[in-house]
Amino acid sequence: MFISKVFVLLFALLVGSALAAPVRIERSLGEPQLSTRGIGQMAQAAGVAIKIKKNLKPTKGKSVFWSGSRPSKNGPVSVEKDAERYAKAKGKEVLAPTLQKQGINIPAQKDSPYSYKLWKYASKVYAQRTSGSAHAVLGSTRRPGNIYDTIEKPELMKNKKVTKLTEHNAETGKKTVVK
């Protein structure tokens, strides 16, 4: 039986994460419930990771990334909707709808402790497989260690298939070509 190196690596990563997480049994689920739930979530995450590896294929010249927030009358708002509007208006695509379109469903964070890691993995694969020109809609405020600055942008910058990367300031509308 053939088991890919990526599957083994992801499985080891997920198992290691589960073992390293501190759990106070007396305040959480009983031991049998905890282990059943943990193994099920781990198996689900491994399945999603395999689907990401096999199926996530951005269309050439259509990738749009986003990160951060911008000010509004009611306080800071995420630029996610700005990126989605930009992508729709320009015939491009952001990661989440691309995943859905390709049959990949990352569980919500409340449903799986592996959700954040799966989003990071999907973001990395999306950036690595992007080709042609790419765009990023960015807020004037970004969390330290955000996925765009730590994973997506570095992958896009070293990706030889990406011919141009343009960053759009969601607050000012200013465009900056960074690659």
Descriptions of predicted regions:
Residues 43-179:
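Catalytic toxin/effector domains delivered as secreted proteins or via bacterial secretion systems
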Residues 1-36:
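Fungal secretory targeting signals
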